[in-house]
Amino acid sequence: MDLKEAFATIFDQNRKVALYAAGTTVAVLGLGLVFKYMRREEKLTRVGVVTKLLVHPLKSGKAVSVEAAECLRMGLKYGELRDRHWLVITEDGHMVTGRQQPRLVLVSLTCEGGHVSLNGPQMEELKFPLNNSSDLVVDCRVFSVDVQGRDCGDKVSEWLTRFLEADKPVRLVHYEPDLKPQRPHEKEPLFPKDDEVAYPDAAPVMLMTEASVGDLNSRLDKDLSVFQFRPSIVVSDCEAFTEDTWDHIRIGEVELKRVIGCGRCLFTTVDPETGVFSRKEPLETLKTYRMTDPKQKTSPILGQYYTVRKTGVLHVGEPVYKITY
């Protein structure tokens, strides 16, 4: 091969490389443009501000009000406390809630330094280890759904049975990560198939607004607090019942997706300060104007259930943004 042919060969090879590179660049740019125009542009609208974060470690127990909490796929977490990760059950594993034992709302469960503390009016404080692998794992039933929990021992059982003045012994179980959870999708197909919760009625997060409770109070003889309705997140600086329209929201780095309205039951008639049933209000009044979700049949709606799309830390005082496209 002479010099002329060698240069011709090199030129031809370089031209092919250049054409290939140019083609690749055009393809990448083209895909970028397609992605840009196919991607929905996100719009954030401020709709309120977080005024309360409430963790309910014990299902039907007293709320723990915190200034900040982790928002995980299974709900709120504050230190060693996780939302609705403790459950009172009968000896055969069926759940016991404030619907059957209204005095449960007076029981405080806290946790520090690897030990759990139970407190209640006119009761001595009871402490026990958070993790005790020697305790049995038991099968439980929450609204006819099979779940599991680790039994917290006989002393805890005796304390709760005595405080509740129960006819038969009750026991306390604790949900641990390797145990069988609830899958909300099995009860309500609108929930994501991969959602898991411990012992909540339905969802990892329930949000409501102070204005909605204020609207209800304007129709009652006695003002009620948000604590009567057991939300995870309370929002203010908005109009009543606007949470019904917040399909997709962002709070800080957390993203939540609305699934279904929170249908209210007889439990709302338990006074969280006294543990006494009224059996009428506020449920009867709610039924007169909040039968707004056919999916909840005969239950009036107050608050909304959310699934956690993106985890993070929530803070009281953070703005709430509605996401639209």
From Swiss-Prot:
One of its GO terms (biological process) is nitrate metabolic process. It is a single-pass type II membrane protein; Lipid-anchor. It comes from the Eukaryota. The keyword Lipoprotein applies. Residues 37-325 are cytoplasmic. GO terms for cellular component: mitochondrial outer membrane. Keywords: Lipoprotein, Membrane, Metal-binding, Mitochondrion, Mitochondrion outer membrane, Molybdenum, Oxidoreductase, Signal-anchor, Transmembrane, Transmembrane helix. InterPro entries: MoCF_Sase_C (IPR005302), MOCOS_middle (IPR005303), Pyrv_Knase-like_insert_dom_sf (IPR011037). Its EC number is 1.7.-.-. It is found in: Mitochondrion outer membrane; Membrane. It is an enzyme of class 1 (oxidoreductase). Pfam families: MOSC, MOSC_N. Residues 85-175 are annotated as: MOSC N-terminal region. Coiled coil: none annotated. Comprises two structural domains, the molybdenum cofactor/Moco sulfurase C-terminal (MOSC) domain and the MOSC N-terminal region, forming a cleft that accommodates Moco. The MOSC domain, which contains a large seven-stranded mostly antiparallel beta-barrel, engages multiple interactions with Moco both pterin ring and phosphate group, allowing for a tight coordination of Moco within the core of the enzyme. This is Mitochondrial amidoxime-reducing component 1. It comes from Danio rerio (Zebrafish).
